[in-house]
């Protein structure tokens, strides 16, 4: 079966997010009242697997090996 997978990769909450801070400052300059902005990545893919659990495990392995940097980021996986 083919499963649609959505992966969210975000900076660790303990770390400064310079891109988020820049956007937060720019929005404030434009009059928007937005705070605690974090900028990350959204990855959408299809995985061929026997089950939803196998698709999740496959996506998790891809994240650990390539799609995220564990020193600076965390990830969340949603198999649809």
Model-predicted regions and their roles:
Residues 2-42, 46, 51-80:
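Long, contiguous binding/interaction regions
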């Amino acid at each position: 079966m083919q499963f649609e997978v959505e992966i969210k990769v975000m900076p660790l909450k303990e770390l400064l997010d310079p891109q988020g801070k820049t956007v937060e400052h720019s929005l404030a300059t434009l009059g928007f009242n937005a705070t605690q902005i974090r900028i990350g990545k959204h990855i959408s893919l299809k995985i061929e697997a026997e089950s939803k659990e196998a698709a999740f495990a496959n996506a998790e392995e891809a994240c650990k090996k390539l799609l995220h940097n564990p020193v600076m980021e965390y990830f969340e996986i949603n198999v649809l």
